[in-house]
């Protein structure tokens, strides 16, 4: 019986942890072509703030260097006022 109750408690803890995790994993934007073996994090940080990161994505680009992709925290959603 102790094993069954501990399994139930662990399951509940696991579900609560997932319920408390923030769902927003961030936003992405492409900033144009980037040179091979160069980081584009500086461009991303200048555009989206200090917490942004950038990388060259070679899988979607038609240019030889790749496409600069930025990952940054999404701005908060502002609710619209109702016009009723």
Swiss-Prot record:
Q: What is its main location?
A: secreted
Q: Which Pfam families match?
A: AtDEF-like (PF25052)
Give an example GO biological process. killing of cells of another organism
Location of this chain's protein in the cell: Secreted
Q: Where is the signal peptide?
A: 1-23
**Which cysteines bridge via disulfide bonds?**
27-74, 34-56, 40-68, 44-70
Keywords, comma-separated and alphabetical = Antimicrobial, Disulfide bond, Fungicide, Plant defense, Secreted, Signal
InterPro entries named in the record: DEFL, LCR
What do the Gene Ontology cellular component annotations say? extracellular region
Coiled-coil regions listed? none
Which protein family is named in the record?
Belongs to the DEFL family.
Name of the protein in question: Defensin-like protein 172
Q: Which organism is it from?
A: Arabidopsis thaliana
């Amino acid at each position: 019986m102790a094993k069954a109750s501990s399994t139930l408690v662990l399951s509940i803890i696991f579900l609560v942890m997932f319920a408390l995790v923030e769902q927003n994993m961030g936003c992405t934007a492409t900033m144009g072509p980037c040179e091979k073996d160069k980081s584009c994090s500086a461009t991303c940080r200048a555009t989206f703030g200090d917490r942004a990161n950038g990388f060259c994505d070679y899988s979607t680009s038609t240019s030889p260097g790749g496409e600069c992709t930025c990952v940054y925290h999404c701005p908060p959603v502002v609710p619209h006022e109702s016009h009723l």
